[in-house]
Amino acid sequence: MAPKAEKKPAEKKPTEEKAEKKPRAEKRVPGKEGGEKKGKKKAKKSVETYKIYIFKVLKQVHPDIGISSKAMSIMNSFINDIFEKLAAEAAKLARYNKKPTITSREIQTSVRLVLPGELAKHAVSEGTKAVTKFTSS
């Protein structure tokens, strides 16, 4: 029975050690181990924008004019909205004709329906030119 009495004081020592380990855990958060985690960076989500292309067109039309980031964001949103409208209209046309695919014809018709007057005519001519250039190369 005497050995059991000796075990009780031994059990108190690990509890004292656990109390000592708590400050170590606190040190880990701001310590150097956080620096080691910098090696593993999260992969950035690729967000597709039209900013580069908007800028290229701006420089073709007005080489001396710049654009603010807020204006660029508005232009990017505008292009996304127009493309969504065109895609939705092209999808409707494909469904009406009971076709499973959206072809250049559906896109051309949706451009004529979504865009007004002269803008539609210019868009159709530029689109036709782009498709012809793509198929010839």
Curated annotation (Swiss-Prot):
<protein>
    <recommendedName>
        <fullName>Histone H2B.4</fullName>
    </recommendedName>
</protein>
<comment type="subunit">
    <text>The nucleosome is a histone octamer containing two molecules each of H2A, H2B, H3 and H4 assembled in one H3-H4 heterotetramer and two H2A-H2B heterodimers. The octamer wraps approximately 147 bp of DNA.</text>
</comment>
<keyword id="KW-1017">Isopeptide bond</keyword>
<dbReference type="GO" id="GO:0046982">
    <property type="term" value="F:protein heterodimerization activity"/>
</dbReference>
<dbReference type="InterPro" id="IPR000558">
    <property type="entry name" value="Histone_H2B"/>
</dbReference>
<dbReference type="GO" id="GO:0030527">
    <property type="term" value="F:structural constituent of chromatin"/>
</dbReference>
<dbReference type="InterPro" id="IPR055333">
    <property type="entry name" value="HISTONE_H2B_site"/>
</dbReference>
<dbReference type="GO" id="GO:0003677">
    <property type="term" value="F:DNA binding"/>
</dbReference>
<keyword id="KW-0238">DNA-binding</keyword>
<keyword id="KW-0544">Nucleosome core</keyword>
<dbReference type="GO" id="GO:0005634">
    <property type="term" value="C:nucleus"/>
</dbReference>
<keyword id="KW-0539">Nucleus</keyword>
<keyword id="KW-0832">Ubl conjugation</keyword>
<dbReference type="Pfam" id="PF00125">
    <property type="entry name" value="Histone"/>
</dbReference>
<keyword id="KW-0158">Chromosome</keyword>
<comment type="function">
    <text>Core component of nucleosome. Nucleosomes wrap and compact DNA into chromatin, limiting DNA accessibility to the cellular machineries which require DNA as a template. Histones thereby play a central role in transcription regulation, DNA repair, DNA replication and chromosomal stability. DNA accessibility is regulated via a complex set of post-translational modifications of histones, also called histone code, and nucleosome remodeling.</text>
</comment>
<comment type="similarity">
    <text>Belongs to the histone H2B family.</text>
</comment>
<feature type="modified residue" description="N6-acetyllysine">
    <location>
        <position position="27"/>
    </location>
</feature>
<dbReference type="InterPro" id="IPR009072">
    <property type="entry name" value="Histone-fold"/>
</dbReference>
<feature type="compositionally biased region" description="Basic and acidic residues">
    <location>
        <begin position="1"/>
        <end position="37"/>
    </location>
</feature>
<dbReference type="InterPro" id="IPR007125">
    <property type="entry name" value="Histone_H2A/H2B/H3"/>
</dbReference>
<keyword id="KW-0007">Acetylation</keyword>
<feature type="cross-link" description="Glycyl lysine isopeptide (Lys-Gly) (interchain with G-Cter in ubiquitin)">
    <location>
        <position position="133"/>
    </location>
</feature>
<feature type="region of interest" description="Disordered">
    <location>
        <begin position="1"/>
        <end position="45"/>
    </location>
</feature>
<feature type="modified residue" description="N6-acetyllysine">
    <location>
        <position position="7"/>
    </location>
</feature>
<dbReference type="GO" id="GO:0000786">
    <property type="term" value="C:nucleosome"/>
</dbReference>
